Amino acid sequence: MKILNLVIPLKKGNPIFNGINLTIQPGSVYGLLGKNGIGKSTLLYMMCGLMFPHKGSIRFDGIEVKRRLPETLEKIFLVPEEFDLPSISIDDYVRRNSVFYPNFNIDQFNQYLSDFELEHTKNLAKTSMGQKKKYLVSFALATNTPL
């Protein structure tokens, strides 16, 4: 992933990021640190095509992420800090969402559930936030996306 000349304005007009350039290398682990409200989540959402930069570009495999092409989105998965899960079982969730990720591996997913000591719950919406995160991390890892 390449981020080129990225500008993200604050609501008050001062840029959060002004002309940032960054290359994310495959197989590497990165940390994103900063104060609350400084734009960490905004940057991640832009990297996933969920928000769009004011100026600059974010490319994955040479394609602008903001185009939201299926062949790009199937290679990216984000586990956000805050999220809701629908009132369905984890099996229904997997059935409905794994089709968007061609490298999804159900055996890996089941192993992650076992590692996290999670059951195939009947209603994801009624689980604790900690359990929801474990379910979503299990799904995310099993997608085998590069990012």
What feature does the model see in each segment?
Residues 13-15, 70:
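Short coil-to-beta microelement around the adenine-binding A-loop and adjacent beta1/P-loop entry
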